[in-house]
Amino acid sequence: MNNEKSLSCIILCGGMSRRMGEDKGSMKIQDKPMILYILDTLNHMINEVVIVLNDERRVSKYSAIINQYQKNNKPFDFTITYVKDEIQNKGPLSGILTGLKNISTDYGLILPCDSPYIKKEYINTMINTLENLND
């Protein structure tokens, strides 16, 4: 399996932010939004990212954050698609459904937007597990 061309990542960013009071994926750690840590980790590992958000305002916000970051840094080597939850306010399962409907590969790794310290080793473990299932 060529992991660069056969795996997508769905990042769930559609939470209501009731407990935090603000959108978690755009919250900054050391002046860098959490979503960017995840995208940096995924670079050179997958073919596409589908970011699932809950409204058009967040689509614009995330698009601006990511576009500005790529303008100031090396661009990501995967495509990024922004989609709105098909079923609003029903939790992460509706985000997963929306994400799976919008990937172009057979498999999608699902990550929450508030996991900035996800390691490449974890992604590799998931890819290797998938490869073993397909052997």
Locate each region found by the language model.
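Nucleotide and nucleotide-moiety/phosphate-recognizing core
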Residues: 2-135
